[in-house]
UniProtKB/Swiss-Prot annotation:
One BP term from GO: response to corticosterone
Any Pfam family: Serpin
InterPro entries: Serpin_CS, Serpin_dom, Serpin_fam, Serpin_sf, Serpin_sf_1, Serpin_sf_2
Upregulating conditions: Up-regulated by dietary stress. Significantly increased expression between days 0 to 5 in egg whites of eggs laid by corticosterone-fed hens (at protein level).
Annotated SMART domains: SERPIN
GO molecular function, one term: heparin binding
Protein name according to UniProt: Ovalbumin-related protein X
Tissue expression from the record: Expressed in egg white (at protein level).
Source organism per UniProt: Gallus gallus (Chicken)
PANTHER family, per database record: SERINE PROTEASE INHIBITOR, SERPIN, SERPIN B4
Protein family according to the UniProt entry: Belongs to the serpin family. Ov-serpin subfamily.
Signal peptide: none
PROSITE patterns membership: SERPIN
Gene Ontology cellular-component annotations: extracellular space
């Protein structure tokens, strides 16, 4: 699915070694969205600008956290595997994503999503179909993090090659992610219906403006994918 990660112009006669990393994710929900409920709706890129998006919709029971101090809601959507979940971090305001990006760290994320904060509630979820493909040159990023020795002629890479003066010429990363309505069971199964019957009237989680999302491996509490959805 990830094509042309390295274009011909990205290498030349001086290129000795290129570090390439790619990640592909196409998730299947534990509970499918009904494709008949998907509608074209506006996605508010800013307070002044919106773009059309195919918005999926489901009324079901999910783990949700409402964080008034952070002016944000968090929704957990489980995937079919049972080990993976998607967490959506939705600011209350259209223009508030940058503020959350500046304050978020692993400790805060762990606090926001722990069982004492998240609770299972009946929620009407609006979530755009997502198909994201991005490519990044990470050379300058890695050097800014202090990994400078890899990119200079005196790099010590004898553990992988006996070639002299071997260094990494550039580091390239590609990511592809696709999410649609597909799931392994339909909303409205007996267990879900009974759960919803004993819940108050459903609230809305309307992801119609920029948000953060992450894919988490629950058994190890490991984040395997972290991204931003800011425009269709």
């Amino acid at each position: 699915q990830i094509k042309d990660l390295l274009v011909s112009s990205s290498t030349d006669l001086d290129t000795t070694l290129v570090l390439v990393n790619a990640i592909y994710f196409k998730g299947m929900w534990k509970t499918a969205f009904n494709a008949e409920d998907t509608r074209e709706m506006p996605f508010h890129v800013t307070k002044q600008e919106s773009k059309p998006v195919q918005m999926m919709c489901m009324n079901n029971s999910f783990n949700v956290a409402t964080l008034p101090a952070e002016k944000m809601k968090i929704l957990e959507l489980p995937f079919a595997s049972g080990d993976l979940s998607m967490l959506v971090l939705l600011p209350d305001e259209v223009s508030d994503l940058e503020r959350i990006e500046k304050t978020i760290n692993f400790e805060k994320l762990t606090e926001w999503t722990n069982p004492n904060t998240m609770e299972k509630r009946r929620v009407k979820v609006y979530l755009p179909q997502m198909k994201i493909e991005e490519k990044y040159n990470l050379t300058s990023v890695l050097m800014a993090l202090g990994m400078t020795d890899l990119f200079i002629p005196s790099a010590n890479l004898t553990g992988i090659s006996s070639a002299e003066s071997l260094k990494i010429s550039q580091a390239v990363h590609g990511a592809f992610m696709e999410l649609s309505e597909d799931g392994i069971e339909m909303a409205g199964s007996t267990g879900v219906i009974e759960d919803i019957k004993h819940s108050p009237e459903s609230e809305q989680f309307r992801a119609d403006h920029p948000f953060l999302f992450l894919i988490k491996h629950n058994p190890t509490n490991t984040i395997v994918y972290f991204g931003r959805y800011w425009s269709p």
